[in-house]
Design a protein with these regions (language model features):
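Interfacial helix-loop-helix junctions of multi-pass membrane proteins
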Residues: 26-36, 84-117, 121
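Hydrophobic faces of alpha-helical transmembrane segments in multi-pass integral membrane proteins
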Residues: 14, 43, 47, 51, ...
Length: 133
């Protein structure tokens, strides 16, 4: 089970590592204005991927019952939304503690959260849990 679980984590980790390389090595977010938009959308997809497969594993293990498509959708949607909020909190704390300028405005903050949630919605709308459970 853990091997399968780690395989579900590989996509989100790859997205995060890609983000780190773009930020720390290439300073790409300052050079390519639209990169932030695409990465938040991709981050929402990655989070939804991990959450979806985690819910399926919890269902198979009889820890959580998510056989209803509505229950599955609401769980994934709610957890993706919570994850985007937590990510933005982390950015705020980084800005505050290290005097960085990651969150340039409230508009940017809301756009980032919106794009993460939309990415999650796109993933969950195309995902078929009935084929997995």
């Amino acid at each position: 089970m853990w091997k399968r679980y780690l395989s579900y984590l590989s996509f989100p980790l790859a997205v995060f590592l890609f983000h780190c390389v773009l930020t720390l090595v290439f300073d790409a977010y300052d050079r390519i204005e639209q990169l932030d938009t695409g990465m938040h959308f991709l981050g929402g997809i990655a989070i939804a991927h991990f959450i979806s497969h985690t819910i399926i594993q919890l269902d198979r293990s009889k820890i959580l019952s998510a056989r209803s498509p509505i229950t599955f959708f609401l769980l994934v949607f709610g957890l993706v939304a919570a994850s985007t909020v937590m990510w933005e909190f982390a950015e705020f704390i980084t800005d505050y503690l290290f005097d960085m300028n990651i969150q340039v405005s409230v508009t940017n903050l809301m756009k980032d959260q919106f794009l993460g949630i939309v990415g999650g919605l796109v993933y969950v709308a195309s995902f078929r849990p009935d084929r997995q459970i």
